[in-house]
Amino acid sequence: GAEVLQQAATHLIADCAGSSGASVLFVAADITTVEGRAAVFSVRKDFDIVVTNAGGPPPGDFRSWERDTWIKAIDANMLTPIELIKATVDGMAARGFGRIVNITSSAVKAPIDILGLSNGARSGLTGFVAGLSRSKLAASGVTINNLLPGAFDTDRLKTTMKGAAEKSGQSMDAVMDARRKTIPAQRFGNPQEFGAICAFLCSTHAGYMTGQNVLADGGAYSGTF
């Protein structure tokens, strides 16, 4: 929650002070709410780089999800990123530079049965970005891409695997080991690797990439395209 964010911000401030000298501001807010977004934009509005990464909806069986559960997932994982894009993209275009990266999921390309809420909501965002990224924004130096993580060693992975273990009746260790063996790299990714890919997409070096869905999954997706 807010305490974790504050700890991360403290470390980031220390790192920047010792290297680039850049200043760091942080806001603890629920970005999926109107009030949370207002709190962020009260600090500043002229963002050149925006990375959206709302927490994924819970795994489960679609038969147990009520309409409100679906709406909450769509609001957080589709509509919130769209609102953030809407609030920043025209300013980016006016300044001639902008980078937007949406953290979605490899389930967009290879849906996972217990992640139906994520599959649906994030696929909607993917379709929206496919159109917007190829509009006049591309000629204004603004790129919009999606970064699709596979199985990374995070709390989110553990939550998903816990759901799979409960559904199958297997132990957590057995489910984790079986999942690991499906990945050609034979391991889970680490957050530092993921951050480096995201940093590249936000850099000037990625100026000719837009509207792409970039998979980082250790080779797990077996499709040609």
Predicted segment positions?
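Substrate-binding pocket helix/loop in short-chain dehydrogenase/reductase
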Residues: D61-R63, T69-I74, I100, R179
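A short, exposed helix-loop element centered on a Lys and neighboring polar residues
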Residues: I85-K86, A130
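A conserved structural motif in NAD(P)-dependent oxidoreductases
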Residues: S168-M172, I183-F194, H205
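Conserved NAD(P)H cofactor-binding loop of Rossmann-fold oxidoreductase domains
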Residues: A54-P59, G219
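Short C-terminal tail/terminal secondary-structure segment
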Residues: A110, A199, T210-F225
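Catalytic loop of short-chain dehydrogenase/reductase
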Residues: R99-A138, G150-F152
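Short, small/polar-rich loop/turn modules that mediate ligand/substrate recognition or access, typified
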Residues: A138-T143, M209-G211
